[in-house]
Amino acid sequence: MRRSSVMSVVAVVAATGLLLGGCTSDKKNANSGPAATVEIKPTGDYNPLERDQIKDGGELTLPILEVPEQSNSLHGNAIVDGTTLWRWYNPQMTLADGDGTWHPNPAYLTNVNAEEVDGKTVVTYDINPDAVFNDGTPIDWRVFETMWKFNNAENPDVVANSTDGYDQIESVTTGESDKQAVVTYKQAYPWWQALFDRVLHPSVADAQTFNEGYLKNPHPEWGAGPYKVDQFDYNSGTVSFVPNEKWWGEKPKLDKVTYRQMESQATINAYQAGEVDAVEITNKDHLAVAKTVKDTTLRGTLRPSNYLVTLNAKTPTLEDVKVREAVFTGINRETLAQVRFNGMDYTENLPGSFALFQNQKGYQDNFGGLVTYDQDKAKQLLDEAGWTEGSDGIREKDGKKLTLRYVTFGDSQLTKSTAAAMQKMLKDIGVDLQVAERPSSDFSKVIAEREFDVLTSGFTSYDPYGVAYFKQVYASDSELNKSGTGTPEMDKKIAELQQLPTQEEQIKRANELEKEALQQYGIMPYVNGPQLYATKNGLANYGSYAFALVPKENIGWAK
């Protein structure tokens, strides 16, 4: 399970054992009485209920910020919203508890066995005999082979989201039958549970199909699971799913699931009007509105994500590492955090790593030791880079002003306040930060085409195996990190990191390498934060998930 990009209008991730002030903790009615806090539960808060406690029938309507044109969740331009939609109609091979504990999904995998043979990790997957794609193609060992071939970095024409782990596989073969896949790694590989949460239909047979086959085409016939595509309108931003008559597992509880694309501010208005059944609370204004809505449950959790500032080193102005260091040195991360959490009675330590989160074993603050807010130092760095202060205070070099384009998405007040804070801080060191406002639906396009100098966005993790994705974050060909600051030297060191046989050894080395990689000054973490959802009372197995992956057929309304 890899990481995906998410636009920065969403505040996510809370540290263990926190309480968030200013919102109700009542689980029946948001108007039933004034309560001071809602608990931030580190292992998820999504009303887990057994199937016999959930009604048969009903509909679920949810907001989404973008229905991206790229529907392949494994593609390098995939974003969180695309992955959210993908999971409703494609094989969900594995499940997880909120703390990240991994389980095979019995609807697809009847048994999984991992062992070490001659120094190599060998994982055997027994596939459910009934598992089949919507077009009748069996889900067998070939889907594992297809997944491996398109994510192992061997074909330079394939634009994969991440090759971490898959590039460590030596072979994928059939076992005792076509319904058994045997995955053999090149050496001992400690993160094997991070792989094959998803699989690809064997019809994805070449790079062009992988890269372009899902553009404005969800390929419902290549899907499988309890739900199938009912409507997928990329223009209107409406996507819906209904029960799949070809599903072999437990009957899905809902009659229909609908996503509607809307801007961040519109999501809370739609929830207040009863037009959607759940909404993410991203700022104090959303929180205030959610508290007024009857029959609402507020849910808070730890959802591992890093929000970050990215500098595009591929642009002429930012290709100089001294300029990038100056920009980061001139940004007060504490100020950005205060803007993010304004009115939410919440504080946290500044994040310092993209490899691990602050509550994970082995975490180190690898960024904080490199960069501290210091305007005088930032100005000195710009002096050294040849940018001198002009009469208006803006730096100049060779007759050109030091102007950077900061692209934002959506219309939320949080986005505007963050932009204003960034402009003020950078103006103080002589940088003219021009804000370019774009609709939320442009996020994936801007990311894919690097149409920015400065960007705030997020890296969202789906599992606790962060070091397993070190290459995805820091390699020179990363499709996640759009700063363009990777180097061949770091690529070589990452390859050596991935050869280490234990998680402990990889974590230790990853911390050392991250300190080096961050000295390219391409990405800067500035907050994690709480994830809050407002949901209608009775919504089961949905909300703030942390690391949880629940069976889609079990989402529904409590009896």
Descriptions of predicted regions:
Residues 110-157, 182, 317-319:
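Aromatic- and charge-enriched surface segment that lines or borders ligand/interaction sites
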Residues 234, 388-461:
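Ligand/substrate-recognition segments at binding pockets and active sites
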Residues 87, 98-99, 197-252, 256, ...:
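Gly/Pro-rich hinge or "lid" segments in bacterial periplasmic/extracellular proteins
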Residues 242, 321-424, 559:
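Append "and occasionally in soluble cytosolic enzymes with long acidic Gly/Pro-rich linkers
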Residues 43-44, 331-363, 414-423, 447-559:
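Detector for C-terminal structural segments
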Residues 58-116, 222-223:
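N-terminal lobe/hinge region of extracytoplasmic solute-binding protein
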Residues 243-289, 432-434, 439-440:
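Ligand-site clamp/hinge motif
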Residues 53-55, 124, 160-209:
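Surface-exposed binding/hinge segments that line
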